């Protein structure tokens, strides 16, 4: 299953060598309120050294690297493999925080208007294929430089989905019966800000964002930032 998306993409690329590239992204989660060790229910009598170690581990766990491989009509987005964490020296404090396992590859075909995502459910691997719709981006008359590229701003309003509303309602019902240690915030509409460059004429970007007149180099969500650190292009034969 893990080879399916790669095979789809490589096969197509063999017929579309005129323009392709790779964009490397770095993402990090933004924490609105400082999360403390005692919030996890571990121990309320925490010394400053452990609190500092926890904050550093939390920061590292929220940072991930991704690779977007693309041509003019397709792209594949995947999380890069993380290096094994070095073992702590004897006597040093070490805290590890993990949010989730490695994410599956995401493949988009702009011609077919479909997206394919690898996912694992109950230990079995699945390939989920869904139709894609072009987001209703609002282009903003504002620009800035990201590396060597001139980028332009765009905004996207993402309303709360019915699924999110239902999940929150179910959480509230469970809270009435048995309060949970972890709280769920009420979902709200959110505004996504993107920075794209027409200098790279593809309509793709990180994390399934697409539909702008140029490669997306930066995404700002309320609690997540995705930045492009490097772009490698191969336009031989164009």
Residue ranges and their predicted role:
Residues 18-238:
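Extended soluble regions of mature proteins
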């Amino acid at each position: 299953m893990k080879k399916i998306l790669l095979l789809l993409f490589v096969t197509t690329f063999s017929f579309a060598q005129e323009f392709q590239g790779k964009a490397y992204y770095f993402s990090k989660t933004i924490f609105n309120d400082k999360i403390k060790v005692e919030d996890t229910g571990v121990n309320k009598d925490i010394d400053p050294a452990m609190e500092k170690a926890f904050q550093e581990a939390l920061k590292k766990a929220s940072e991930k690297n991704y690779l977007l491989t693309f041509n003019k009509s397709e792209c594949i987005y995947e999380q890069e493999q993380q290096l094994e964490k070095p073992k702590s020296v004897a006597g040093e404090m070490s805290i590890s925080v993990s949010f989730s396992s490695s994410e599956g590859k995401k493949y988009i075909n702009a011609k077919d208007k479909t997206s394919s995502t690898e996912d694992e459910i109950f230990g079995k691997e699945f390939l989920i294929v869904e139709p894609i719709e072009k987001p209703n981006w609002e282009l903003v008359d504002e620009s800035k430089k990201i590396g060597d590229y001139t980028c332009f701003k765009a905004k996207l309003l993402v309303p709360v989905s019915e699924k999110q509303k239902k999940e929150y309602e179910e959480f509230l019902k469970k809270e009435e019966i048995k309060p949970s240690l972890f709280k769920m915030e009420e979902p709200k509409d959110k505004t996504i800000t993107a920075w794209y460059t027409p200098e790279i004429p593809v309509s793709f970007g990180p994390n399934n964002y697409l539909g702008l007149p140029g490669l997306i180099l930066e995404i700002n969500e309320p609690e997540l930032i995705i930045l492009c650190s490097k772009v490698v292009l191969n336009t031989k034969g164009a």
